[in-house]
């Protein structure tokens, strides 16, 4: 965090937060008028269980809180909203970003189809928060049951958080 240029931090916020707010705001009036529509805001498991990237986790937590808050206000309008919180997904994202992921256990990877299927199933079921993949459902559930201090310690030790903020 402290080693990044302010412009890099702002760019992350622009993509992860500002664009979500602006696109949601742009789409809602027509959906509300039609009493129909669905919005899926892409968050991350990192928004539910803070990890190594503090600014990334914080931006995704914003998306989760924003979506949950908006869901209450949309009740009865015919418009559904969801925060999609996937874990690691097999896409070109990490490679393009130059993030080395070879040490990540295979069991933590999700396929794109798993994420899409989970998202659509949860949207149909009326779930505001969608966490695709059994492994991530377990992780987020357990993380919600243990003290935050333990999560912080695990983040420091297991996930080598030092220097990646």
Which residues make up each language-model segment?
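Residue(s) in the substrate-gating loop at a strand-loop-helix junction
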Residues: 44
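A short helix-coil junction within the Rossmann-fold of NAD(P)-dependent oxidoreductases
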Residues: 26-35
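Active-site helix of classical SDR
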Residues: 24, 59
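Active-site-adjacent segment of SDR/Rossmann-fold oxidoreductases
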Residues: 49, 69-80
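C-terminal helical subdomain
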Residues: 83, 103-139
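Substrate-binding pocket helix/loop in short-chain dehydrogenase/reductase
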Residues: 1, 5-10
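Short, flexible catalytic-loop segment of classical short-chain dehydrogenase/reductase
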Residues: 86-96, 100-102
